[in-house]
A protein has these predicted regions:
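N-terminal positively charged helical leader segments and presequences
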Residues: 1-70
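Structural motif
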Residues: 4-5, 38, 61-62, 78-81, ...
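Fold-independent oxyanion-binding glycine-rich loops
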Residues: 10-11, 22-23, 44-45, 85-86, ...
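Non-catalytic positions within long, well-ordered alpha-helices that form the structural scaffold/packing
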Residues: 29, 99-102, 202
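RNA substrate-binding interface of SAM-dependent RNA methyltransferases
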Residues: 72-165
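Active-site/ligand-binding-proximal alpha/beta "capping" segment
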Residues: 159-200, 206-211
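Structured adenosyl-cofactor binding patch, chiefly the S-adenosyl-L-methionine
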Residues: 195-237
Length: 237
């Protein structure tokens, strides 16, 4: 049977027993796990601990750890998705899909046309839960680090190496191939970037890239850009 995946704060050592409570224990009960069932423990660092259930109660599940190893690494290098802040439910969808598509980081950006955005107190914990659940579903051993919202200028300054692309409908066609290494994708609000923002990005060494489509919602553009980036990195020159 497929191994259930449970999230822990820190991956336990081989031969140890790990007691899991709270939401992950509830997840184990929802999966109807029983003593002897195989499980995979992940902590978001790219490693996995394989083991089996040795006890299961109403409040906790205990796992005996049999092996720990690094999960298969992404062949292309880390992808950083920076997206102009949108409504929280749409951010949750972006976070979920970014995790499934292997983004290493997700940063919310406050642009000129998203100045009214204010992150609610519960937004960061909610996005953290979303990416953890998405990683379990996609069987990934890591998930994006969440940051922001940061100012547009700060987002530009934060990326100094690798390929840096800012999406713009009037920009150059999205690259068919990209060199291996870090890639940053800057996705704007539906109203688009201002001329001043585009000029600032170009002056900072970013390249424009177009998805060759009509006007897209921010979440659609984010997923399309991630998908094209993975394909372009697979065809790296």
């Amino acid at each position: 049977m497929p191994r259930a995946r449970l999230v822990v704060e820190t991956l336990p050592a081989i031969g140890s027993r790990c007691r899991i409570e709270g939401e992950e224990a509830a997840h184990a009960r929802a999966r109807r796990l029983a003593v002897g069932d195989p499980v995979v423990l992940v902590d978001g660092t790219g490693r996995e601990a394989h083991g089996s259930v040795v006890s299961l109660t109403r409040v906790a599940v205990e796992v005996a750890v049999e092996s720990v190893h690094a999960a298969a690494a992404e062949a292309h290098g880390p992808i950083h998705l920076l997206v102009a802040a949108v409504r929280s439910e749409r951010l949750s969808w972006i976070a979920e899909k970014a995790t499934e598509l292997g983004a290493a980081r997700l940063t919310l950006v406050a642009s000129q046309r998203t100045q009214r955005f204010r992150a609610s107190e519960g937004l960061a914990p909610r996005l953290e839960r979303v990416v953890r659940e998405a990683a379990k579903q996609a069987e990934r051993a890591s998930w994006p680090a969440i940051a922001g919202p940061v100012a547009f200028a700060e987002a530009l300054r934060g990326e100094t190496a690798g390929t840096r692309l800012i999406l713009d409908p009037s920009g150059e066609p999205f690259p068919a191939a990209l060199p291996a290494g870090a890639t940053a994708l800057l996705v704007g609000p539906e109203g688009g970037w201002t001329d001043a923002e585009l000029q600032a990005a170009l002056s900072a060494g970013w390249l424009t890239a177009s998805l060759a489509a009509g006007k897209l919602r921010a979440e659609t553009a984010a997923v399309a850009a991630l998908t094209l980036t993975r394909a372009a990195l697979a065809r790296r020159p």
